From Swiss-Prot:
Organism whose genome encodes this protein: Mus musculus
Biased composition (Pro residues): 268-279
Keywords, alphabetical: Coiled coil, Phosphoprotein
Name of this protein: Smoothelin-like protein 2
InterPro entries: CH_dom (IPR001715), CH_dom_sf (IPR036872), F-actin_Monoox_Mical (IPR050540)
Top-rank taxon, per record: Eukaryota
Stretches of the chain forming a coiled coil according to its record: 24-88
Polar residues compositional bias, start-end: 120-129, 163-174, 298-308
Amino acid sequence: MEPSPDAEEAHTVREALGRYEAALEGAVRALHEDMQGLQRGVERRVAEALRLAGPLARTVAELQRDNQRLQAQLERLTRQVEALGLATGVSPAPGTPSPPPAATVTDRAPRLGTARFSSHATFSLSGRSPSVEHDEASDLEVRRASNSCILENGHQLDAGPANGSSEVQTSSAQEPPRPRPVSLSLRMPHQPVTAVTRVSEKFSGETSASALSPTSAAIVGGFTPSPSEAISPWTPSPTEKSSSFTRSLSGSGYGAVTAGKRKDSPPLVTPPQSPPSSQPPAMTQAPRQGERRRELVRSQTLPRTSGAQARKALFEKWEQDTASKGKGETRAKLKRSQSFGVASASSIKQILLEWCRSKTVGYQHVDLQNFSSSWSDGMAFCALVHSFFPDAFDYNALSPTQRQKNFELAFTMAENLANCERLIEVEDMMVMGRKPDPMCVFTYVQSLYNHLRRFE
C-alpha cells in the first residue's frame, strides 16, 4: 500500500522541522558558550580592577587617619601656644588701658602693627622643653632693665622744645614702654630671618609716605643696616621716623611666625617746629641714636646661633653657589627634577613600550606601536619571550595567522621559564580579536617586564 501524498508531505515537514530545531539548538548552545566566556572575562577584569584598587583604598584610609592625627596634634599645639602666650605675657592684661585715638594719618601704621601682632599666635611649636618659659621670663627681665630708656621702635627721646619734650616725658613716666616679647621660635638655630623696615614720614602736615626696604636675610650672623637707617644731618623741620620690623621665620613645623610692634605702647607726641638755634644738642645725639637703634635692631632680629653652626651654614652656602654655573642651568635642573618626580601614566606606558621595542628589534612580524593591535596576533609576545630564552622554541617557525598557537606558546613559556602568571587567557585574546583591550595587554606586559628583567 503506497503512502498518500499528504503523508509524504507531512513526513518531509517533520524532517525539515527537526533539522531546523537541531540547528537552532546548536546556535543557542554556541551563544551560551560565548556568553559564559564573556562572563568569565568580565569577572577576571573586575577582579583585576579590584586588586589594583585595593592599595589605593588602603592609602586613602591611611591618609584619612594621618589627617585626623594631624588635626588632633594641631589642636594640642594650639592649646600649648595659648598657654605659652599667657605664661610669657604675649596677650595684653585685661586691665591695661588702651592708648587714646590719634589722627587718621598717624593711626594707619599702628593698625597694621596690631593686625600683625594678632596673627603671630598662629605658629606651631614642637619639641619645646618646660625650661623655655623660665628662660623667656629671665630674658624679658633683662630686656626690660636694658631698654628702660629706649622706645620700642628704636628711637631715643630727642631734647626738643620745652612744650613737646615735657609731653613726651610725662606720657613715658606715666606708662613706661613694655619691651616687645621675643618669639620662642627665635631660639631655634638655622632659621632664615628677614627684616623689613617701614619708614613713614609723619607730623609734617602732609600725607604720610611709607617706604619698604627689605634687608638681606640674616642667616650667618652678620647684619647690614638698610639705607633707611643711615644717619642724616639735622634739619630745621623735625620729622619723626617710626620703624616697625617684621620678622618672618620659616619654621620646620606647621606655620610661620610674624612678630610686629606692640600696640599697647604710648603714642608718640611730636614737638612743634622751632627755629634751628634751639636744636644744637640733637646734632651730637644723632650718631649715638643711630648706633643704639642698630644695636637694638641687631639684638631683636638675628637668631641665636653658635659660631660653629654659622661657619657650617656659610661654607654650605658657598659650596652651593660655586657648584652652580648659572641661574638658567639651576632653574632648568630644578624644573627637570620636579617634572621627573611626578610621572604620568602615559609616560610609564611609553617607557614600557620603548623597552619592548628594544627587546624585539630584528624580529619579523613585530611592529610595536601600541598596547592593542600590535599584540593581537601573539607574535610580539613570542618575540619578547624568545629574546630572553632563544633556545626555548623556534621563532622562525611561527606564523601570524596561527594566533591561538602563538598565544598559547608565549603564555606557557613565560609561565614555565620566567614564573610569570597567566593574567590573560588565550580564549580572551581570541574573543577580543584584532583590537584587544589595552589595559589587559598593558597589565600583562608589565608583569612580563617585572619577571623577565631578572634574566637581563
